[in-house]
Design a protein with these regions (language model features):
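Short, small-residue-biased leader/transition segments that mark boundaries at the very start
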Residues: 1-8
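Short, conserved "post-DEAD/DEAH" coupling segment immediately C-terminal to helicase motif II
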Residues: 11-14
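Catalytic nucleophile loop
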Residues: 16-35, 49
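Histidine-centered divalent metal-coordination motifs
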Residues: 27, 94, 130
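Pocket-forming structural segment of enzyme catalytic cores
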Residues: 35-113
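Beta-strand-turn-beta hairpins that frame and shape the catalytic cleft
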Residues: 87, 120-124
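Short, surface-exposed beta-strand/loop micro-motifs that present aromatic residues
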Residues: 114-120
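Acyltransferase
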Residues: 127-153
Length: 153
């Protein structure tokens, strides 16, 4: 990492991780949590969640960017998904997706490959989809996050 990137990582660890403040990264914000991304070259991320952000390599006929509604398959309990049921739909707009995040993956969707939809590690959460564009399901995710922030921020 170069100086400015180290500063960002250090500040993230100081302000969010160490203090236990809830953090929600949406779309690119989630992608920044990983070790590295290959979007427009190879770039180091914050390294908070192991894994990489890679371009889609999809079967013929599937379009990139992935834009549209997909159902969420919840893999494990996660406070961010407190008001969400398995199979509810969320809205995606992206050309890259996270892979290799293992135990930190809370929910996935299917788009030619399993797409990590929600990650969670401690007080840090991320969604690849856009909750603000995901109707009632998205509002319920934002409601759960809002509840986590009460008295903390």
């Amino acid at each position: 990492l170069v100086g400015s990137e180290m500063c960002i990582r250090d500040r993230f660890n100081e302000m969010v991780v160490a203090k236990g403040k809830p953090f929600l990264g949406i779309c690119l914000g989630m992608q920044m949590l990983f070790d590295r991304s290959y979007e427009y070259g190879e770039h180091e991320g914050l390294g908070f969640i192991p894994g990489e952000v890679v371009p889609f390599s999809l079967p013929r006929g599937m379009k990139v960017p992935h834009m549209g509604w997909n159902s969420l398959q919840i893999l494990r309990e996660c406070p961010l998904l407190k008001y969400v049921s398995n199979g509810e739909y969320v809205y995606y707009v992206h050309s890259y997706y996270a892979t290799g995040c293992g135990e930190y993956t809370a929910a996935v969707s299917e788009y030619g490959v399993p797409v990590t939809g929600v990650v969670a590690r401690g007080n840090v959460y991320g969604t690849q989809f856009h909750p603000e564009k995901s109707g009632d399901t998205g509002l319920n995710i934002l409601r759960a996050f809002n509840e986590m922030t009460r008295g903390v921020l």
